[in-house]
Every structure is written in C-alpha cells, then in structure tokens.
Amino acid sequence: MNGNNNMNNNGKSNNKKKNKNWILGLVVVFLISAIFMSYFIRGGESYKNVPYSTFQSYLDNGLVESVVIIDKNLIQFVVKGSNFAKSYFSTSIPYLDINLLSELKNKKVELSSGKSQASLIGVLLQTLPWILFFIFFFFIFRQTQGGGGKVFTFGKSNAQKYEAGKNKITFKDVAGQEEVKQELREVVEFLKNPKKFEKIGAKIPKGVLLVGSPGTGKTLLAKAVAGEAGVSFFHMSGSDFVEMFVGVGASRVRDLFDNARKNSPCIIFIDELDAVGRSRGAGLGGGHDEREQTLNQLLVEMDGFGTHTNVIVMAATNRPDVLDSALLRPGRFDRQVTVSLPDIKEREAILNIHSLKTKLSKDINLQVIARATPGASGADLANLINEGALIAARNNQDEILMKDMEEARDKILMGVAKKSMTITDRQKLETAYHEAGHALLHYYLEHADPLHKVTIIPRGRALGVAFSLPREDRLSINKHQILDKIKICYGGYASEQINLGVTTAGVQNDLMQATSLAKKMVTEWGMGEEVGPIFLVDDEAPIFLPKEFSKAKAYSENTADKVDREVKRILEECLKEASDILLKHKDQLVKLAKELVLKETLTDKEVRELLGFEANKDEYDLFSSDSTTKEVKGEDVKG
C-alpha cells in the first residue's frame, strides 16, 4: 500500500546521505590543504636539532649563513652551501653567551628574530585535536538528524501519511459494524461531494470520535473512510505529540494541521486521543503543563477549521470518560460513534476475513468458532487464527486442524502449559479438590454458565482452571446470575475445607472476584437489601488527583458500615450455599477430584459421563478467547 512512498523516502534518504558524505569529504580536503599550505608557506624547512658545540664549530669555520633567534635559549641557523644543499639546524643555548651577537656581526651572518617554524609532524599534532573534534561533532549532528532523536526537527509532525488513492482499505475490509459504517458514510460523502451539503447549508461534523473497547477496529474504520473517499490520510498517535521539550507538542499539532490543509481533502486520525486529551486539572507540581499546552493547541486548531477546508478530524479512544469536555462540545468532536464488540454473525464474518490467507482444515466450522467466542473482539479473533496457524506450522502440518485451534485457545486463555513443572502428589490433590469444587457447582446452580473444561495442568500463575462458556451473547447480567457466580467462586474454598480440613493460598483470586462482585451489587447495581437502590461510587474526582486526596467520600461512615455489613452478608450466604451443595454431593466431588488427578484435564462431556449427568444438547466443541473464566487457582505462596 505504501510501496511508492517507501521508495521515495528511501531515495530521499540516500540523497541526504550522499550530500552529507560529500560535505564531510570537502571539509577533510580543506583541512589537509590548509595544513600543507601552512607548511609550504613557511618554506617547507625541516630543522635538525644539534648540540651547541656543533653550532660553534660551524660559526668558527664561517659556514653559518643566517641565524634566527627564537628566544634567549633557542636559535635556528642555516649552514652555507649550494642552493640545493643548504642545511637547516636548530640548537639550544645552554648558557648566556654575551659574545654571541658580536661574533655573528664579525662573521657577517644574517641575523633576525622570529617564531619557531614547526615541522609537518608538529603541525599535524597541533591541528589533529581540532580535526577529531570537528568529525565527532559532525557525526553527532548526523545521528540526531537521521536517527530517532531528530533533535533539530522535533517540532515537526511525524504523522504517517497515506497518499490519496494508495490506501486500498475500504468498508468491504471491515466485517460487521453496519450501523457504524452507515454513520461514517456521511463523512465519505462529504469528502467526495462537499457542494451537496454546502448547497443546502448543512455542516458536516468537524470531528468524529470513535469510542470502543481495544481491538474492535477503530483504526481500521478510519482508514476505510479515507479509502472509500479516496483522500489522503494522516495517522498519528496521541502519545507522539508530547515530548520532554516544552512546546514540542503544540508545534507538532500546528505542523500536522498545516500539512492537512495543504493536502485537503484529507482525514487526520489521532489514535489513543486520551493520551493527549485528558481533562485539564490541578495536577501536582505542574507536571502536566506540556500536555495541556498540546491540548489547548489542538482545541485552537479545530476551532480554526471551516467547512471549506475539506479536512475531517477523526480520533479513537477506549476512555471517553477521561477526555476534556472542551473536546466533546459542538464544533469539535461533536459526533461520537460507538464501536461495539461483534455479535455472533459479525464474529463469523471477521473469522472469514482473517482465514482467507490461511489453510484451514475442512473439519473446522467457523460458525461454531464464532458461537464459542462471545465477547471476543476482532483483534482476539485474528490472534486466535494466527496462533492456530503458528502451532500447525510448528508441527510441520499442511493445514490448520481443530486440535491446533483448541491448543491456541488454551494458550490465549490460560497461558502456556507447564507440563514439565514438578508438582508433588499432595499439591496435585489439593488442586484437584479445588477445581472439582468449582466444576461441580456448575451442574447444580440454575443460573450458572455451562462448564466447558476443567484442568489441573499449571498454566501461567494458575495451578488449575475451571472455565465455562455463556450459552449466548450477554449484554447484561441479573442478580441471580451474579449470586451464582459468587457461589462458584467459593466452590474451591468450600471444597478444600470439606475434603482437606484446611484452605490454601490458591483461593486468593476466588475471594477477590467474589468480594468485587458483592461490592458492585451493593454500591453500583442497587441490589443490596439494607442499603437499597442507590449508586455510591464517586466517579467525578479530578483526573490527576487520587480520589482519597481530592475529596471526601461520597457517603457517610454510617452508610459505609451498612455497605460492609451487606457485602459480608452476601458473601457468607453464598459460601454457605456452596458448601451445602458440595456436602450433599460429596461422593461426586471426590470422584471428580480423583479423575482429575488421573487424567489432569476433563471436558464437560467427560464430566457428565463420569457423574451420570444428562448430556448437554447445546454443547459445542470449541472455546472462547474471551470466555468467562470462573475460577483460577493461583500460585500457592507457600511454595
């Protein structure tokens, strides 16, 4: 897509290198020439140092032609001879010779005073440090210009530019998101035919903010808009604006918008806008001045855009809550488009696109994969296909098999399996009882998600995992489902108490999940009986100040006590119910734990056959890269 740009950039960089090398060579030649000219202008003589007695001998014999007195202790003299046979000497006067001048006059020796005429080696030694210093400075200059520092061009925008017509990405390359694409087609139409809107007085939004979770395709959508409209596309990350130098961010904003105006119609796309567009606050010590200057300049530039400029500013963020309100007012990013996670049909379409360049086995059903990946983003699905391809290539296969996809699932969800990790029989039994407690509750709780797989093979920091798959895409969750989640979290804790008589440190993650859910029930979701339907979380604290530092709590100490009592009551009731179920079906719990010790990994189908449960009619044989992992038994800090 950027082949021509790269060729042009390479050509320019080569020309720059040639120019710099030519300049460096010219400077070196100039210095060498100056050295030799200095040497030859002085006569090119090379004076040989001799003892003072030798000088006296030449003088007594009348052979000294001329003498140059350098100082009171050093003279240079020339011995008579033919024009081609003169000898040049220098000597040091070891004592004060008061008769030397009169003797030179009597011998009619040409007498003068001057500075020492150094030899070529002496000249080189004197000038060499300057030459080395100049070369060192030159290379430092070249590195800062051509390398990552760019000291002398730090005020210039480093946005990636995609020329008009060379961006081949269109809406056809974006699977799903039909409502989002419909919203963005207005932008495309405006860039293609602005007079259509101007004729009736309509004003297209100056800024379009794409809001969504990471990996949902916000950047791809922005490129698709530029590709559909056939205009230039400037892409820059919000973090690229701000540097350590004061004023750099504002300068880069000005340069970016100047370039956009020169290349209109075009699109400016700022990724991760929250890196530069966070709410302006008091801060501590003024450490945010540079970022705020950059934000102010961005606001000014967007105000300076008129409809006649044919420049659209698009941005993406997954944190719209932290953006400065001035960015979101009409006239700036006044249109917000939410890019949501794909549903089952969209996931299948995304998988189809990413699998075009891979060789999938005929037994792989992309519809099944899509159904088994609720909550997965487009990036998750792309990573899933790629991991499966890597595993198949590692095994020297010609195509990707179902087992490769399953292995890729486990790797993405739980980390690399540590099959070589040494685990004692006692630790393996503890982990088996822990995971069996989680797994068994899935079959006796009405609102729990179906179990998919349970394993005691260590992966990452987890010694074992019991994870489930929702029956369908879930947009919300009710109170009964939340309570069952908490009970399943306590399944490992209760099982350890029942079968081992003591609990391990592996319950830490379970307790953390259970407590978090219970607190949200009471303080955010209005599910507490004593506190009632009230929202008790203060989310309006200044962005740059810790909440406990910036303002007091949003509720009284009396209310806080009620919240604590309510949370504790919910947790205790869930733990009791989980323990009662496991005690009632202890035989099945022990049987499942022993089978886990033996086989290490069991699927839902295998657990049902082992414990005599009815087969799951809705069972599907794949995984979710974003499945609801119920419980992860963490590392045992004891060793």
UniProtKB/Swiss-Prot annotation:
Active site positions: E435
Entry superkingdom: Bacteria
GO molecular-function term, one example from the UniProt record: zinc ion binding
Residues exposed to the Cytoplasmic side: 1-20, 142-639
Keywords: ATP-binding, Cell inner membrane, Cell membrane, Hydrolase, Membrane, Metal-binding, Metalloprotease, Nucleotide-binding, Protease, Transmembrane, Transmembrane helix, Zinc
Residues noted as binding ATP in the record, renumbered to the chain: G212, S213, P214, G215, T216, G217, K218, T219
Cofactor(s) needed: Zn(2+)
Sites where the protein binds Zn(2+): H434, H438, D510
SUPFAM superfamilies the UniProt entry points to: FtsH protease domain-like (SSF140990), P-loop containing nucleoside triphosphate hydrolases (SSF52540)
GO biological process: protein catabolic process; proteolysis
Localization of this protein: Cell inner membrane
EC nos: 3.4.24.-
Chief localization: membrane
A cellular component annotation (GO) from this entry: plasma membrane
Membrane topology term: Multi-pass membrane protein
One Pfam family per UniProt: AAA_lid_3
Cofactor: how and how many bound: Binds 1 zinc ion per subunit.
Transmembrane stretches, start-end: 21-41, 121-141
SUBUNIT field: Homohexamer.
Family membership noted in the UniProt record: In the central section; belongs to the AAA ATPase family. In the C-terminal section; belongs to the peptidase M41 family.
HAMAP family: FtsH
Identification of the protein by name: ATP-dependent zinc metalloprotease FtsH
Organism: Borreliella burgdorferi (strain ZS7)
